[in-house]
């Protein structure tokens, strides 16, 4: 464990919240409403052979309009993905889920994953597909520490939070534990609670991400819960602070 993290224990409210919630219901069933038309139109315009789907209120799979995508759908072989490349289809489903989440710090943005510096004769999607395939096959990140300043592989159009979501979806592991989602709201809560680290997730290096994952797993172990629940509490906690600051006395009461 990082020297600065020794003795940094989870807040009591975090422990109470996590212990009171089942992983399957709270995490895996975490659903959002995705505008399939928007995403599929952008996929068509970009020339991708990918179609995203969702479920209607009856639970049936649909491919048009708005539909629900649950966190449990973020996996290879998902029924909600029809794609010529499984990893790339999953990446776009992760992007759609993240951007539609009402409590996470994300905006709807279509990732341009083409490599604009592609050498002649090489497909512009070869780089991103190669990284995604490697992560899915090996359950880890390629070692690019000598090629990029951050340690992250070169993934055109894909930021750290989206990459972390993909790593969680393919059940990847890091040097410090299972990969976890990374959200600005969650890190803001950690810093507010006393974590001594740079608060910007966009600037997270791989080493900093490993430290973050280790902290979540350590807290989960102390509370006999799952790190995904810890991450969710951190995100929801900051979202609750934002709502309270915005709405004041009109804010919905929360267990914090």
For every predicted segment, state its role.
Residues 1-59, 171-256:
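C-terminal accessory module of base-excision DNA glycosylases/AP lyases that mediates lesion recognition
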Residues 76-84, 149-153, 172, 176, ...:
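Short, charged/polar micro-motifs that form catalytic or ligand-binding hotspots
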Residues 79-86, 91-155:
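Helix-hairpin-helix/helix-loop-helix acidic hairpins
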Residues 163-169:
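Short hydrophobic alpha-helical segments that form membrane-spanning helices or hydrophobic packing faces
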Residues 91-95, 166, 230-234:
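Short alpha-helical scaffolding segments that buttress acidic/His motifs in well-ordered protein cores
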Residues 20-83, 95-96, 103, 107, ...:
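A structured, charge-rich N-terminal accessory region that forms the first stable segment of a protein
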Residues 97-104, 169-172, 192:
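Amphipathic alpha-helical interaction surfaces
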């Amino acid at each position: 464990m990082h020297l600065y993290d020794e003795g940094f224990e989870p807040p009591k409210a975090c422990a109470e919240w996590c212990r009171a919630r089942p992983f399957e219901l709270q995490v895996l069933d975490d659903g959002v409403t995705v505008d399939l038309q928007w995403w599929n139109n952008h996929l068509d315009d970009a020339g991708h052979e990918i179609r995203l789907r969702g479920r209607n209120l009856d639970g049936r799979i649909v491919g048009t309009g708005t539909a629900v995508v649950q966190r449990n759908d973020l996996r290879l072989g998902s029924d909600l993905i029809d794609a010529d490349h499984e990893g790339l289809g999953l990446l776009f489903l992760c992007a759609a889920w993240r951007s539609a989440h009402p409590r996470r710090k994300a905006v709807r943005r279509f990732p341009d994953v083409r490599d604009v510096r592609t050498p002649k004769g090489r497909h512009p999607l070869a780089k991103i597909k190669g990284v995604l395939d490697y992560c899915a096959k090996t359950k880890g990140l390629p070692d690019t520490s000598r090629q990029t300043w951050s340690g992250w592989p070169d993934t055109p159009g894909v930021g750290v939070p989206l990459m972390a979501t993909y790593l969680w979806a393919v059940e990847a592991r890091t040097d410090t534990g299972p990969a976890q989602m990374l959200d600005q709201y969650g890190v803001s809560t950690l810093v507010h609670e006393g974590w001594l680290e740079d608060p910007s997730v966009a600037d997270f290096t791989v080493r900093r991400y490993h430290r973050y994952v280790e902290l979540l797993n350590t807290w989960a172990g102390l509370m006999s819960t799952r790190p995904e629940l810890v991450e969710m509490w951190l995100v929801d906690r900051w979202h609750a602070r934002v709502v309270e600051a915005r709405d004041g006395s009109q804010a919905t009461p929360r267990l914090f």
